[in-house]
Amino acid sequence: MKPLPVSIATRPRKYTPLSAYACLSDRNKFISVVFSFFFVSSSERVNMSEPEAEAQREPRDSSKKKKKKKKEKRKISEEEEKEEEEREQEEQVEKEEEKSESVLMRGIFKVGKKSHDVLLTPTRLTWTPIIPESPTGEESVVQAGVVLLQDVFAVKVKRRRMAGQQSGGAVLGLALFHSRRRGRRLEEDTLHLHNASAEHTHSWYNTLKELLTGFSCRPRYVKVFINPSSHKKEAVHIYRDHVAPLFKMADIRTDITADGTISVVPLFRLAAIKHTQPLTDRKGHALSVMKECKLDEYDGVVCVGGDGSVAELCHALVLRAQLDANSPENPVRAALPLGIIPAGSTDVVSCSVHGVRDPVTAALHVVLGHLQQVDMCSFLSNGQLVRFGFSAMFGFGGRSLARAEKKRWMSSSRRREYAVVKTLVRLRPEDCQLSFLPAKSSGSSLFGQQDQGEDKELDTKSAEESWVTNQGLYLSISIMSIPCLSPHAPQGLAPNTSLDTGSASLIAVGNASRSEFIKHLKRYSSSSGQFSFPFVETHSVSAVKIRPRSRIGWSEEESEDEGDSKNTPIIQSEAAALPWNIDGELVEIANEVLIRVHPRLIALYGEEVHEAESTVTCSCI
């Protein structure tokens, strides 16, 4: 081992207390230095004790030292050569991996103002600048460009046309439209390949088109639902300005259902859209349309709207699958994937599969056919299906939404802040019996990865033994099968769950003071810590039952005087309906609610993300 310089060995070291590995590394270095020191100095101590013998062995030792130095130099040079060979081998492996695919086409195009050698393989397109050899023979560093075909969604032939000319024109080359990732966003980008040869250009065009048609997950014909009344009534403009051009460029045919009172003629001119019938945006409208649609004609469904529109379409797709499979009792996996173009106020589901509220990102996920399997929940009361959804809030979340729905004339931000503050002022717990079935470690093994998303019946005895039941006062109970990311909660309302784990996150907030509960709510906007309170418990579950015992209907609560009723819930008649927030929609239920998780019940256009962009702040707490 080569000894380290004394200056390095004696240099004082600074240790980072938070990094045990750094300390361990320094300790190992210190041990090696000490070992080297003793190894070298041992001979010195012997030599000091035997000066006469040293004088006799000096010529012989000096020759040995020279030989050792030569050997060490050889070893060092050999090690350097080995390292260099390893680097070259790694680079060669990378190059071989790129070249292992058969080269389909090779040609010369101008990229920018320089000529490039362009290679096309079944998975990528690369271009390398053509640089003349230097007179001195020195090789210049050449940086090649690459675009994966999985990111390319369109290829067009570029032509020069005169003013008023509708077709034909001199061929200029090709334009490849592809996506480029910037953080969580997907952006449209264009690669221009210039070549004036019509035969050469069309040959490349035909080959590229054939390769792009090989991506079977990409939709060719989609059913589009637009909710013109969502949020700021911008859904039509969002679709026209951001989504329709991308669909047209990717040769995706669309069939739009929108409000007949909204003029959508510009959409038709822009994207060659076929519009079947104008319908209103009433509740249940998507469900009625989905029941009559011939779904086998489409490759997917696209929703332009907020969380309410998304929840209604997901519910409709699963119900339609049950109807087609003649399975009224067991949920069936939706036949078509759903694309979500965010046009609402929070867009929780969109953020959970895109990580950002951006219509271009959402549209590119649809165009490129990025599919993500997602779990859903069924909500039943008295044995009857209430609806399918992704999340539900009982207690604080339900009462806040009930108050917000009464102030529809306000803007969404003011309405939300008013509802939160008012509910905090009149904060009261719910006395209920909470039962849950813990999820197995294998995630979706409880219901199994069965075809069509059907549930397997559980053994009654074992199921009863595994249920965990608690009874008490709860300020809030949330059940979420997805993380529920949003700009208000970048890490999600349920950061301990995922999109396709086959389980849901149960978050039960027990009775606490108003100030402690507000601290809990504030933690959602930060990175972590919202579950570190003693009154908050979380569980990974596959089923939940909530049976209210003492309750008050939200309509009756509004008429009561304010008072300190934090510890004593007001008991009303058994028929009083309680507000539930299911996917942002207000649902009033008077009896026990059973929530069950169904693995991968629907496919959404998007991908798994763990954090959303934080662009919105709430000043109400």
Where are these regions (language model features)?
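ATP/NTP phosphate-donor binding region
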Residues: 2-5, 11-16, 21-26, 39-304, ...
